UniProtKB/Swiss-Prot annotation:
Pfam families: RRM_1. It is found in: Nucleus; Cytoplasm. Keywords: Cytoplasm, mRNA processing, Nucleus, Repeat, RNA-binding. Belongs to the CELF/BRUNOL family. InterPro entries: CELF3/4/5/6_RRM1, Nucleotide-bd_a/b_plait_sf, RBD_domain_sf, RRM_dom. The gene is tnrc4-b. Residues 7-88, 95-175, 377-455 form the RRM domain. GO terms for biological process: mRNA splice site recognition; positive regulation of mRNA splicing, via spliceosome; regulation of alternative mRNA splicing, via spliceosome. It comes from Xenopus laevis (African clawed frog). PANTHER family: RNA BINDING PROTEIN. This is CUGBP Elav-like family member 3-B.
C-alpha cells in the first residue's frame, strides 16, 4: 500500500535496452516498489532512456535518491544515473487553495465547514470588494499538502452552489512566480506583443506544448488530404518564395488578402475550381519570383478585385490597400500572404518569418483600438478548458495566420474562465482554415466547437 506522502521519482540516464523487469533489481533494494514505468514515445513506442518510479514508502525514495543520484553509471552509459523527484512533485509543499464559483451569500464559516472534513485549516478567507460584497471566491490554507490535494480531488467540479454560474472550482493557488508570469503576459498582450517565442515561457507552457504537438499532427493529416490540389510546380514556387524572403525580403511586394472566393472538399475527389487571372503581360517583371508570377498589379487609389495566381490551388481574391505602405512593411506583409496563397506547400517548409515585427504593425490610434477583424475573419471557440487564458488560445490559433486579437471570456465577479473565447484574423482564409482544423479538436475531455462569428449588422463597417 502506498503512503499518502510517497514521492514519485524521475529516473534518467538508463540504457534503452533495459525494461521494467531489468530495472527492478536495481531499485527494490531500497524498499517495496509501488510502480515502475519506463517512458516510451507515445507515437513510435521507442524507449526514451528514462522512467518513473514510485515506492510504497517516502523513506525508500529518499534512500534511493541519496544512494544513486549521480553516484552510479549503468553499463553502456556515459553519464551517471539521475534519480530525483518528478516535476509533478515540485508543488509538494503547496497547501493553499483557491476556491472559485462560490455563492455570493457564503461566509468564511460556510467555506470552512465545507473543507474542514479534509484536514486542519490554518486560514479561510472569502474575498470581498470595498463595499463588503463577496467576490464569489476564497482562499483556504491547510496544514499539509496531502490534505489540500484530498480537498481538490473530492470537491473540484463536484457541485454547483446556489447563486453560482458554474461548478465549484478548487485548485492550488498560484505561486508568486506564476502570478508574475501572468502579469507579464497581460502586459505583453496589452502592448500587442503576441510573439509565440515569448509565450513559451508562460505558466502553462508544458500544457500548451502538448496541445501544439497534437495540433501539428492533425495539421499534417489535413495537408496530406489537400495534396491532390498541389502540383510539383506549386511546391517549388513556395520553396523559392521562402528562400527569397530569407535572402532579400525587401524585394517582395505585399498584397493583402481579404476573402476566400470558394472552399471545396479536401478529400481529393472534387474538381478544383477554374482560375481566372490577369494576362501575364500585365504583370511587371518586379513581381516575378525566379520566373513564377506571384501577384498581379494593384492600384493604390481605388479598391479592385483581382485573382492571385495559385497554380492549381483555390483562388484567393485580393484587394488593393487604401493607403500606400512603406516598402519594408510591404515586404513583411507579402511574406504572410504567400503563406495564404500556397497553404499546403508553405506548411511543408519552415517559414522565415512567423509575423512582422511589432514596429512594422503600428497603426493610427483609431485602428489600434479595433479588436475585431474584417467580416468573415472572426471566430468563436466554445468548450475551452477551464485553465485556458488569452495566451493559450492565441498560441493554439497562431499557426493558421496573423491573429489580430485572442480573448478568453472571464467572469468579472470570480475572475474564472467562462470556457469560451473569440479569435480575430486579418483574412477569411485563416479563419476558415482554423474552423476546418479545430472544430471538433479534442483537448483532454473537451471537444472544441469552432464557428464563424455572425455580425450583428451585416452592413457594419470595420
Amino acid at each position: 500500500m502506498k503512503e499518502p506522502d510517497a514521492i514519485k521519482l524521475f529516473i534518467g540516464q538508463i540504457p534503452r535496452n533495459l525494461d521494467e523487469k531489468d530495472l527492478k533489481p536495481i531499485f527494490e533494494q531500497f524498499g517495496k516498489i509501488y510502480e515502475l514505468t519506463v517512458i516510451k514515445d507515445k507515437f513510435t513506442g521507442m524507449h526514451k532512456g528514462c522512467a518513473f518510479l514510485t515506492y510504497c514508502a517516502r523513506e525508500s525514495a529518499l534512500k534511493a535518491q541519496s544512494a544513486l543520484h549521480e553516484q552510479k553509471t549503468l553499463p553502456g552509459m556515459n553519464r551517471p544515473i539521475q534519480v530525483k523527484p518528478a516535476d509533478s512533485e515540485s508543488r509538494g509543499e503547496d497547501r493553499k487553495l483557491f476556491v472559485g464559483m462560490l455563492g455570493k451569500q457564503q461566509t468564511d464559516e460556510d467555506v470552512r465547514r465545507m473543507f474542514e472534513t479534509f484536514g486542519n485549516i490554518d486560514e479561510c478567507t472569502v474575498l470581498r470588494g470595498p463595499d463588503g460584497t463577496s467576490k464569489g471566491c476564497a482562499f483556504v490554507k491547510f496544514q499539509t499538502h496531502t490534505e489540500a490535494q484530498a480537498a481538490i480531488n473530492a470537491l473540484h467540479g463536484s457541485r454547483t452552489l446556489p447563486g453560482a454560474s458554474s461548478s465549484l472550482v478548487v485548485k492550488f493557488a498560484d505561486t508568486e512566480k506564476e502570478r508574475g508570469l501572468r502579469r507579464m503576459q497581460q502586459v505583453a498582450n496589452q502592448l500587442g506583443m503576441f510573439s509565440p517565442i515569448a509565450l513559451q515561457f508562460g505558466a502553462y507552457s508544458a500544457y500548451t506544448q502538448a496541445v501544439s504537438d497534437q495540433l501539428m499532427q492533425q495539421q499534417a493529416a489535413l495537408v496530406a488530404a489537400q495534396s491532390a490540389y498541389l502540383n510539383p510546380m506549386a511546391t517549388m514556387a513556395a520553396v523559392q518564395m521562402q528562400q527569397m524572403a530569407t535572402i532579400n525580403p525587401n524585394g517582395i511586394i505585399a498584397t493583402p488578402i481579404t476573402q476566400i472566393n470558394s472552399i471545396t472538399s479536401s478529400s481529393g475527389t472534387s474538381t478544383p475550381p477554374t482560375l481566372t487571372a490577369t494576362p501575364v503581360s500585365a504583370i511587371p517583371a518586379t513581381l516575378g519570383v525566379n520566373g513564377y508570377s506571384a501577384v498581379p498589379t494593384q492600384s493604390t487609389v481605388q479598391p479592385s478585385s483581382e485573382a492571385i495566381y495559385t497554380n492549381g490551388l483555390h483562388p484567393y481574391p485580393a484587394q488593393s490597400p487604401v493607403a500606400q505602405l512603406d516598402p519594408l512593411q510591404q515586404a513583411y506583409a507579402g511574406m504572410q500572404h504567400y503563406t495564404a496563397a500556397y497553404p499546403a506547400a508553405y506548411g511543408l517548409v519552415s517559414p522565415a518569418f512567423t509575423q512582422p515585427p511589432a514596429i512594422l504593425t503600428q497603426q493610427p490610434p483609431q485602428q489600434q483600438q479595433q479588436r475585431e477583424g474584417p467580416e468573415g475573419c472572426n471566430i468563436f471557440i466554445y468548450h475551452l478548458p477551464q485553465e485556458f487564458t488569452d495566451s493559450e488560445i492565441l498560441q493554439m490559433f497562431l499557426p493558421f495566420g496573423n491573429v489580430i486579437s485572442a480573448k478568453v471570456f472571464v467572469d468579472r465577479a470570480t475572475n474564472q474562465s467562462k470556457c469560451f473565447g473569440f479569435v480575430s484574423f486579418d483574412n477569411p482564409g485563416s479563419a476558415q482554415a482554423a474552423i476546418q482544423s479545430m472544430n471538433g479538436f479534442q483537448i483532454g475531455m473537451k471537444r472544441l466547437k469552432v464557428q464563424l462569428k455572425r455580425p450583428k449588422d451585416a452592413n457594419r463597417p470595420y
